[in-house]
Swiss-Prot record:
Source organism: Duck hepatitis B virus (isolate white Shanghai duck S31)
InterPro entries (alphabetical): HBV_HBSAG
Record bears the keyword Transmembrane helix: yes
Stated name of the protein: Large envelope protein
Function, as annotated: The large envelope protein exists in two topological conformations, one which is termed 'external' or Le-HBsAg and the other 'internal' or Li-HBsAg. In its external conformation the protein attaches the virus to cell receptors and thereby initiating infection. This interaction determines the species specificity and liver tropism. The large envelope protein probably also assumes fusion between virion and host membranes. In its internal conformation the protein plays a role in virion morphogenesis and mediates the contact with the nucleocapsid like a matrix protein.
Chain segments annotated as transmembrane: 166-186, 239-259, 293-313
Subunit structure: Large internal envelope protein interacts with capsid protein.
PTMs per UniProt: Myristoylation contributes importantly to DHBV infectivity. It is most likely required for an early step of the life cycle involving the entry or uncoating of virus particles. Phosphorylated on pre-S domain for about 50% of L proteins, the L chains with internal pre-S region (Li-HBsAg).
């Protein structure tokens, strides 16, 4: 009772080989604590694995594996049985040769085939395919077309947000421009009046500087020529003289511009070495930056407008020398 049949020698050899492989494989499996990363074995595990594999290779080279014991590690049998080689008798070999010869004779002859020609390239014209007319599959397919909304949507253009800083800056710039223009207009009229007074003083004696039109019966107070109020007949003549003086100034400015274009020719003919040396020395002292030149001329203009007659004469001479040197430099 309870007796099991005796195991054969082959079964015992297989079981013994499996026990040996289990012991060897147990040494290759890391046991105990692992490293801080939790992924790699320690150096002791690696050394055990190397030693175990050396023993396994030694046993395999010696052919010490029992039959069927290599399936645990996937190792092949070190001494596999060679497959039986087919043995052909001369009669069987002759029969095979005869059968192959008959097959070659009975085989139908090959028909001459035409080599395949390369297909002609297919080129689409713009009118052949709707995809080439700036459309896509999604646009042409009815399922992907945008359906019309049930409620009409009114699209309004986006309103641009105006920045208060930009608006205030534009208004401030406009006010400053008007103020500067009004100031320059007043100063230009003042300059023209002074030139007109100088002209009158040259052509009239000092005792007769009063307006000649104030004795024509107009109800106006006594005044000097060139300062006629509204209602005096000399008012229009005064502004006519101012306009003539303004035209003369423009003519002088145009002449200076013409001289700047032909300065080298004129200086070459007149041989003004001293003048050219003076202009070159002044131009060497001038700044090269245009903004600095504008600031210099504007500063001289402000000094001229807010100073006395003697200082204005000096500033005027300085301005003329600076402009002449600047024209000579250019």
């Amino acid at each position: 009772m309870g007796q099991q049949p005796a195991k054969s020698m082959d079964v015992r050899r297989i079981e013994g080989g499996e026990l040996l492989l289990n012991q060897l494989a147990g040494r290759m499996i890391p046991k105990g604590t692992v490293t801080w990363s939790g992924k790699f074995p320690t150096i002791d595990h690696l050394l055990d694995h190397v030693q175990t594999m050396e023993e396994v290779n030694t046993l395999q080279q010696q052919g010490a594996w029992p039959a069927g014991a290599g399936r645990r590690l996937g190792l092949t049998n070190p001494a596999p049985q060679e497959p039986p080689q087919p043995q052909w008798t001369p009669e069987e070999d002759q029969k095979a040769r005869e059968a192959f010869r008959r097959y070659q004779e009975e085989r139908p002859p090959e028909t001459t085939t035409i080599p395949p020609t390369s297909p002609t390239p297919w080129k689409l014209q713009p009118g052949d395919d709707p995809l080439l007319e700036n459309k896509s599959l999604l646009e042409t397919h009815p399922l992907y077309q945008n359906p019309e909304p049930a409620v009409p949507v009114i699209k309004t253009p986006p309103l641009r947000k105006k920045k208060m800083a930009g608006t205030f800056g534009g208004i401030l710039a406009g006010l400053i421009g008007l103020l500067v223009g009004f100031f320059l207009l007043i100063k230009i009229l003042e300059i023209l009046r002074r030139l007109d007074w100088w002209w009158i003083s040259l052509s009239s004696p000092k005792g007769k500087m009063q307006c000649a039109f104030q004795d024509t019966g107009a109800q106006i107070s006594p005044h000097y020529a060139g300062f006629c109020p509204w209602g005096c007949p000399g008012f229009l003549w005064t502004y006519l003289r101012l306009f003539i003086i303004f035209l003369l100034i423009l003519l002088v400015a145009a002449g200076l511009l013409y001289l700047t274009d032909n300065m080298s020719i004129i200086l070459g003919k007149l041989q003004w070495e001293s003048v050219s040396a003076l202009f070159s020395s002044i131009s060497s002292l001038l700044p090269s930056d245009q903004k600095s030149l504008v600031a210099l001329m504007f500063g001289l203009l402000l000094i001229w407008m807010t100073s006395s007659s003697a200082t204005q004469t000096l500033v005027t001479l300085t301005q003329l020398a600076t402009l002449s040197a600047l024209f000579y430099k250019n």
